Amino acid sequence: MNNKKTATNRKGMIPNRLNKFSIRKYSVGTASILVGTTLIFGLSGHEAKAAEHTNGELNQSKNETTAPSENKTTEKVDSRQLKDNTQTATADQPKVTMSDSATVKETSSNMQSPQNATASQSTTQTSNVTTNDKSSTTYSNETDKSNLTQAKNVSTTPKTTTIKQRALNRMAVNTVAAPQQGTNVNDKVHFTNIDIAIDKGHVNKTTGNTEFWATSSDVLKLKANYTIDDSVKEGDTFTFKYGQYFRPGSVRLPSQTQNLYNAQGNIIAKGIYDSKTNTTTYTFTNYVDQYTNVSGSFEQVAFAKRENATTDKTAYKMEVTLGNDTYSKDVIVDYGNQKGQQLISSTNYINNEDLSRNMTVYVNQPKKTYTKETFVTNLTGYKFNPDAKNFKIYEVTDQNQFVDSFTPDTSKLKDVTGQFDVIYSNDNKTATVDLLNGQSSSDKQYIIQQVAYPDNSSTDNGKIDYTLETQNGKSSWSNSYSNVNGSSTANGDQKKYNLGDYVWEDTNKDGKQDANEKGIKGVYVILKDSNGKELDRTTTDENGKYQFTGLSNGTYSVEFSTPAGYTPTTANAGTDDAVDSDGLTTTGVIKDADNMTLDSGFYKTPKYSLGDYVWYDSNKDGKQDSTEKGIKGVKVTLQNEKGEVIGTTETDENGKYRFDNLDSGKYKVIFEKPAGLTQTGTNTTEDDKDADGGEVDVTITDHDDFTLDNGYYEEETSDSDSDSDSDSDSDSDSDSDSDSDSDSDSDSDSDSDSDSDSDSDSDSDSDSDSDSESDSDSDSDSDSDSDSDSDSDSDSDSDSDSDSDSDSDSDSDSDSDSDSDSDNDSDSDSDSDSDSDSDSDSDSDSDSDSDSDSDSDSDSDSDSDSDSDSDSDSDSDSDSDSDSDSDSDSDSDAGKHTPTKPMSTVKDQHKTAKALPETGSENNNSNNGTLFGGLFAALGSLLLFGRRKKQNK
């Protein structure tokens, strides 16, 4: 059986058949997962390394003291400067880089407008670094890392999950009890490949040595690899000891809290830095109880101790002891002090708590005489706090007090702050001091120290600018800052745990596992990490059990697929997590023990049916009546909520249809209108008796639905056929036989005048009026047959024998009038009113037959010795008038179709038997017969009267 679900089958049911479901099963090999854990083994997760950049513009033509010019160092020389100031800034000034979480770059610029003399010095100083993992996570010094691990370990499970803890081989008590004070395990933490490196670094072109330029973006980085013995337990300690010239941090002082983190932000060891002893003591957390074979590497930002390493271009022994492993390296330090500059500044340190900049400014190191000397400080992103009274002005009494590290021993300086007025302006962002203080001239030298506090309302990166305005012009110096990160890694073989439990059939749908309820085999279960990444998948066994193995402590997500034919039961029913259902998706937390409480329950999904009836609504009222029948063969389509066709069927001989094996949900039923039928009215009465229309939306909720009906009626058609057939036949036959034999010796004068008038008038009138008005179906057949037969027979027999010797004068006047009048009037009126289809056929057949037979036989025998003069004049007038009038009026008023077929036909039923040869139009047939009949009758009469006249004589 193929259990693979395609994208198509996944969307809906198979049309018009029972949907059968089988539980799918994947055979998945369970693989043990060895999780490599990344550790951040660094110092002071709360500290940011600061790199200081200083740029100065001087009023000297040349500066004999070498100054760093490779990195952000420029010097402009004023042509009006005295020739003794011929020092040129070189590229031998230092730049220091330290791998703390932030490097603050300070740039100092000293400008003198008239002279255009510029010297640029870049100084990078670093504070303590926050150790980062391989994912480059940065922890700033100001962040309290002590709460980070707690936040990471908070379970995201939406309900309380009971976890069965497994006792460990060691430290089992420590997993539930407060950590006990451990012992120093410096001998169990082993460091190799220790190095103190200068990040970036600058090469002295004269000596070829790489130097650490503390104020030019260089940083120092302490690097090492390490391993931790498995015997180390929570609460044990180890130390980092820094030497006389080396400390953690950067320009920013190291914070007291120095924690070590792993890649996920979990605390491995908590460190406390003691600035007096320059030592950090670390205490292991229970991380070491959860992992074995822990090893790693780290990179930590560090900085020269400015109060001890005070002189530029001097190699200091940077020494550190990690655990019991000691390492030292000579590092040449240069802070970039330019003794010929009349104005130069540097950041002494950045306070770790409030991030204030503690600045040191050297004024008039060359000891020149000024007649004008105004010192101005402009802050960007910072503010002064006049109430703090930390703007100090010291008078230098010994040239050696200008130490290169900008960290003078102020106890040996003369504090003259009270002699000057510091004028604050620009919302305490500008401070101005007149260093002449009313004197006409002065060559005094000053060291000015001030504190600049971050301006929280500012969005600028921050900058501190200094200006010294003298009679020779302006000199300026600028300090700016940027961040630099350190990093570290660590890994170990983590202790492994299991997660899983059970998928069961909840037959009573109460959301709880009962003793008689069984597991469901073949349910897919997917395991994901807290970020939603799939880690593994498996399938429940024949008992409904599943398990994921080889898992580390952490938060996981478990997803259950709904087996075919089932519905998820109620989740989190009751208070016992061990026997309830956790739903389709749940969260499980592993914390030093297996978690076998993640269950899910399902019950078999009941199947439902829908359908009913399609009927012929003969009275078009939209309601099913007892006399109305179903319509067979109507196509019905079923769609799911997505509009996908999931079934088609046709109504049976009773108009019934049905769809089965349906889940609860939304569907659409579509009826296809049969040809020749019209949709009846919808929703006219009760739902189980009315019509629902061509498309019906229906929702099945735990029940069948057999109320989905539809009705149709026949389309309106009227057919009216009116046929009128009128046949008029007039047959007039006149036969005249005259035989005259005259023998006369004398004189006979015979005058015969025959006037025969035959008038045949046949009038056939057929009037058919068919009026049909129908709404439905009416078949009306009207047939009118009218047959009129007129037979007129006139027989005249005349025999005349005349024998005369004398004059015979015969005057015969024969008047034969044959009048045949046939009047046939057929009136057919058919009125049909039907509801649907009206077919009116009116057939009117009128047959008029007129037969006129006139027979005249005249025999005249005349014998005369005399003169016989016979004059026969025959005038025969035969008038036959046949009038056939057929009037068919068909009026049909119907809703659909009304064909009207009028037809009028005159039929000659006797034409074959009796008709004379045609000598004219068909209407003159009877007239010709009458004419000849009259002529023969007249001739006969003439002979008859001739004979009589002869006899009379």
Curated annotation (Swiss-Prot):
Query: What span is annotated as the signal peptide, if there is one?
Result: 1-50
Superkingdom: Bacteria
Note the subunit structure.
Answer: Homodimerizes; via N2-Domain. Interacts with host NRXN1; this interaction mediates bacterial attachment to host cells.
- Is Phosphoprotein found in the keyword set? no
- Protein name, per record: Serine-aspartate repeat-containing protein C
The free-text function statement in the UniProt record for this protein reads: Cell surface-associated calcium-binding protein which plays an important role in adhesion and pathogenesis. Mediates interactions with components of the extracellular matrix such as host NRXN1 to promote bacterial adhesion.
CNA-B domain sequence ranges: 496-606, 607-717
Position of sequence motif LPXTG sorting signal = 916-920
Report the sequence similarity comment from the record. Belongs to the serine-aspartate repeat-containing protein (SDr) family.
Bias (Basic and acidic residues):
72-83
Renumbered to this chain, the Acidic residues biased-composition regions fall at 685-695, 712-892
Its record classes its membrane topology as: Peptidoglycan-anchor
Q: Where is the composition biased (Low complexity)?
A: 115-132, 918-933
Q: Where is this region: Disordered?
A: 51-160, 678-933
What the entry lists under PANTHER family is as follows: TOL-PAL SYSTEM PROTEIN TOLA
- Record keywords, A-Z: Calcium, Cell wall, Peptidoglycan-anchor, Repeat, Secreted, Signal
Q: SUPFAM superfamilies annotated for this entry?
A: Bacterial adhesins, Hypothetical protein PA1324
- Any one GO biological process: cell adhesion
Checking InterPro entries in the record gives: Adhesin_Fg-bd_dom_2, Adhesion_dom_sf, Fibrogen-bd_dom1, Ig-like_fold, LPXTG_anchor, SDr-like, Sdr_B, SDR_Ig
Biased composition annotated in UniProt, kind: Polar residues: 56-71, 84-114, 133-160
